[in-house]
C-alpha cells in the first residue's frame, strides 16, 4: 500500500494492487495525456449495469420505463458528484495549472467517480467492483420510496430536457409497419434538427415505439451532458 493513499483506500473500502490505476483515475486531462478519460468510459458502463441489476432485482413489479428513469436518477451527474465528495475524492484529484481550483466542480467529480470504478474493475474483477459500488450506494438505494418518486413517460421527459436547453422538439414518424394485424411491429424514427440526431426504435404499437425512441434519445443526450434540470 502506498502510504499517502492508505487513508483514501480505507474510505473507498478497497485496496489497489496496482496503485497506478488509481493515479490515472484521479488525473485530469489538464495535467497529462495519461488521464482518467478512458477509465471514465469504462466505469460509466460498469456502474450503469450494476445499478440496473440491483434495481431489477429489488423492484420486481416496476415497468421497464420506470426502472430506466430510476436508474437515471441514481447515475446522474449530481448524484455521482455527491458520492465522490462523500468519499473524499475531491481531496485527491490531480489537476493541471489551468484547472486549479476545479476539485469541487461537479463535472470533474462525476468523471473521477466513474473513472475510479473503472480502475477498481481493472484492478480486480466484476464481483469485487460490484460489491464496492453497492456499498457506496447502500444508503441511497435503501432509502428509495417509490410512492414519493414522480415518474414521467420518456417522451415527456425528453421534451422537458430539450425545452430546458432551448432546443426544438423532435419530430416522430413511422418508418415501417411489419407483421399481421394482430402482431404488428412499428418502427418509429425521431429526428432532432437542432442536435442533428436521428434515432429509431421498434414497438408493438406506435405509442410504445415512440416511447422507446425517446428513451434512446435521452440516453444519447445524457452522453453529451444534457440532463433534466431539477
Swiss-Prot record:
The record's listing under Gene3D superfamilies reads: 3.30.160.20, Ribonuclease III domain (1.10.1520.10)
Report the catalytic activity.
Endonucleolytic cleavage to 5'-phosphomonoester
Listed binding positions for Mg(2+) are: 40, 111, 114
CDD domains to which the protein is assigned, alphabetical: DSRM_RNAse_III_family, RIBOc
Residue positions of the active site: 44, 114
Q: Where in the cell is it found?
A: Cytoplasm
Please list the GO biological process terms of this entry.
mRNA processing; regulation of gene expression; rRNA processing; tRNA processing
Q: E.C. number, please?
A: 3.1.26.3
Domain DRBM span(s) in chain numbering: 153-223
Which segments constitute the RNase III domain? 5-125
Q: The organism sits in which domain of life?
A: Bacteria
InterPro entries under this entry? dsRBD_dom (IPR014720), RNase_III (IPR011907), RNase_III_dom (IPR000999), RNase_III_sf (IPR036389)
Query: Where does this chain mainly localize?
Result: cytoplasm
| Keyword Nuclease recorded | yes
Instruction: Provide the Gene Ontology terms for cellular component.
Output: cytoplasm
The record's Pfam families line, in alphabetical order, gives: dsrm, Ribonucleas_3_3
The main enzyme category here is: hydrolase
Q: Which cofactor does it need?
A: Mg(2+)
Q: Which PANTHER family does the UniProt entry name for this protein?
A: RIBONUCLEASE 3, RIBONUCLEASE III
* Function field: Digests double-stranded RNA. Involved in the processing of primary rRNA transcript to yield the immediate precursors to the large and small rRNAs (23S and 16S). Processes some mRNAs, and tRNAs when they are encoded in the rRNA operon. Processes pre-crRNA and tracrRNA of type II CRISPR loci if present in the organism.
Q: How does it assemble?
A: Homodimer.
**What family does this chain come from, according to its entry?**
Belongs to the ribonuclease III family.
Q: What is this protein called?
A: Ribonuclease 3
Amino acid at each position: 500500500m502506498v502510504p499517502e493513499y492508505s487513508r483514501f483506500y480505507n474510505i473507498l473500502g478497497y485496496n489497489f494492487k496496482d496503485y497506478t490505476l488509481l493515479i490515472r483515475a484521479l488525473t485530469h486531462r489538464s495535467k497529462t495525456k495519461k488521464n482518467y478519460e478512458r477509465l471514465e468510459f469504462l466505469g460509466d458502463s460498469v456502474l450503469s449495469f450494476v445499478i440496473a441489476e440491483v434495481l431489477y432485482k429489488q423492484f420486481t413489479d416496476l415497468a421497464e420505463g420506470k426502472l430506466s428513469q430510476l436508474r437515471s436518477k441514481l447515475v446522474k451527474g449530481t448524484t455521482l458528484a455527491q458520492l465522490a465528495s462523500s468519499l473524499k475524492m475531491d481531496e485527491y484529484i490531480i489537476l493541471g495549472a489551468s484547472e486549479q481550483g476545479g476539485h469541487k466542480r461537479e463535472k470533474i467529480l462525476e468523471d473521477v467517480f466513474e473513472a475510479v470504478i473503472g480502475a477498481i474493475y481493472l484492478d480486480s474483477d466484476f464481483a469485487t467492483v460490484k460489491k464496492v459500488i453497492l456499498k457506496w450506494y447502500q444508503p441511497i438505494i435503501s432509502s428509495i420510496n417509490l410512492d414519493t418518486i414522480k415518474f414521467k413517460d420518456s417522451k415527456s421527459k425528453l421534451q422537458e430536457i430539450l425545452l430546458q436547453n432551448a432546443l426544438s422538439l423532435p419530430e416522430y414518424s413511422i418508418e415501417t409497419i411489419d407483421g399481421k394485424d394482430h402482431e404488428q411491429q412499428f418502427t418509429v424514427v425521431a429526428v432532432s434538427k437542432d442536435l442533428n440526431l436521428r434515432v429509431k426504435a421498434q414497438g408493438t404499437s406506435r405509442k410504445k415505439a415512440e416511447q422507446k425512441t425517446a428513451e434512446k434519445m435521452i440516453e444519447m443526450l445524457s452522453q453529451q451532458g444534457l440532463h433534466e434540470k431539477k
